[in-house]
Amino acid sequence: MALIRKTFYFLFAVFFILVQLPSGCQAGLDFSQPFPSGEFAVFESCKFSRGKCRKECLENEKPDGNCRLNFLCCRQSI
């Protein structure tokens, strides 16, 4: 009886470890493509929600620091 319970817990733990691994599908926000209009998708806010992390800033925005990798923190020009 104890062997069955230990086996069940082991398989249960292995299942949750395998679920956490990426499936190879690149359908997340990190891999999203630009919109048809040429604007890049907004990923997240930056600097206490004072801007948006983008690949390129829009015409009415100015770069104000970096977010991650090669993304810029874009703020509205005043």
Swiss-Prot record:
> InterPro entries of this UniProt entry?
Beta_defensin_dom
- Write the record's keywords in alphabetical order, separated by commas: Antibiotic, Antimicrobial, Defensin, Disulfide bond, Secreted, Signal
Q: Tell me yes or no: is Magnesium among this UniProt entry's keywords.
A: no
Annotated GO biological processes are: defense response to bacterium; innate immune response
Signal peptide (UniProt feature, chain positions): 1-27
Intrachain S-S bonds: C46-C74, C53-C67, C57-C73
Name its cellular compartments.
Secreted
Q: Which GO terms describe its cellular component?
A: extracellular region
Per UniProt, what is one Pfam family of this protein? Answer: Defensin_beta_2
Major location category of this protein: secreted
Family designation? Belongs to the beta-defensin family.
Q: What the protein does?
A: Has antimicrobial activity.
Q: What is this protein called?
A: Beta-defensin 105A
Gene name, Swiss-Prot/TrEMBL: DEFB105A
